[in-house]
Regions:
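Transmembrane helix exit motif
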Residues: 60-68, 107-133, 246-261
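Interfacial loop-to-helix junctions that mark the boundaries of transmembrane helices
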Residues: 1-6, 95-105, 134-135, 205-209, ...
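Membrane-interface alpha-helices at helix entry/exit sites of multi-pass transporters
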Residues: 41-50, 72-78, 172-183
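Membrane-interface helix caps of multi-pass small-molecule transporters
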Residues: 20, 35, 88, 92, ...
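Hydrophobic alpha-helical transmembrane segments in multi-pass integral membrane proteins
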Residues: 89-93, 145-157, 193-201, 208, ...
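Selective hydrophobic functional segments
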Residues: 48-101, 190-240
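Selected transmembrane alpha-helices and immediately adjacent juxtamembrane segments
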Residues: 1-42, 128-179, 263-264
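Residues within membrane-spanning alpha-helices of integral membrane proteins
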Residues: 8, 51, 106-110, 114, ...
Length: 264
């Protein structure tokens, strides 16, 4: 595929939309990834290319957060070990699985996100989360983050929210502390997944740079929406875009399992 000006502009727009949505509630990749696939990139290449924008968003988000609030790096670093291991495995699976199978998995994730968004409540509205330790298995915590890493490496979309959910609901971490840990870990694990995609050549660097530019500006713009407490409008548009993405992936993306299921 020889990129044109329209391809570059669409990639910037994909990053912009992803950055805004990710800053407000997460799962911005559910918008940018279908847009990159729509440009003609194979799903695995679109997945890898999108990670450049994701890394830019998370790095800038970490820097912005660090200038305002402290981050418990020790606790986050311990949990990041299993998260990184899972991420590497998930990314390897993503570059080896057949594109048609990945498409079906991705469509399933988008549909689940739509349902979850409709029926879930905001975790930040729950005041009963504390930093007090509770009786639980630390080993299970590590296994949970290993599973989160597998998902992060393969799909990534909504990963930050899933980490936040586990930290608050399972580990009973205060929401402010969970937000800090989530911000740090998101920034840490993304380069490991990106490395796997680079290693296997599943990156379009020119479009990836455009996604990164759009994502950086989108993250800044999303933060302004949060400051103005004008996030519901963006979330409504996110739902509309997500539904359109599902329809597009189902109707216009070739999903035939003609080339097997997994490459060894």
């Amino acid at each position: 595929m020889e990129p044109t000006l329209i391809h570059y502009a669409t990639a910037v727009l994909a990053g912009l939309a992803s950055g805004i949505v990710s800053e407000i509630g997460g799962a911005g990749s559910l918008i940018s990834l279908p847009m990159l696939i729509g440009l003609g990139l194979p799903p695995s290449v679109a997945n890898g290319t999108n990670r450049i924008g994701v890394m830019t968003q998370y790095t800038m988000g970490y820097i912005r957060y660090l200038t305002r609030k402290p981050i418990p790096h020790k606790e986050a670093a311990i949990l990041s070990v299993t998260l990184v291991l899972g991420t590497v495995g998930g990314a390897y699976f993503a570059v080896r699985i057949a594109d048609a199978v990945f498409n079906w998995i991705f469509i399933g994730v988008m549909i689940l996100t739509i349902l979850f968004t409709f029926f879930s409540k905001e975790l930040t509205d729950r005041p009963d989360s504390t930093d007090d330790p509770v009786s639980r298995s630390r080993a299970v915590d590590y296994l949970v983050f290993l599973g989160l890493g597998l998902y992060c490496g393969m799909i990534q979309a909504g990963m930050a929210y899933l980490m936040f959910y586990v930290l608050v609901k399972r580990m009973h971490t205060a929401t402010k502390t969970a937000e800090a840990i989530k911000t740090y870990m998101s920034m840490i694990v993304t380069p490991f997944a990106l490395f796997i995609f680079i290693w296997f050549g599943h990156i379009d660097w020119e479009l990836g740079a455009c996604v990164a530019v759009g994502g950086g500006f989108g993250g800044w713009l999303g933060e302004k929406f949060v400051e103005r407490k004008d996030t519901h409008t963006v979330k409504d548009w996110f739902m509309v875009a997500l539904i359109i993405s599902v329809v597009y992936m189902l109707l216009f993306v070739q999903l035939h399992l003609h080339d097997g299921i997994f490459y060894l």
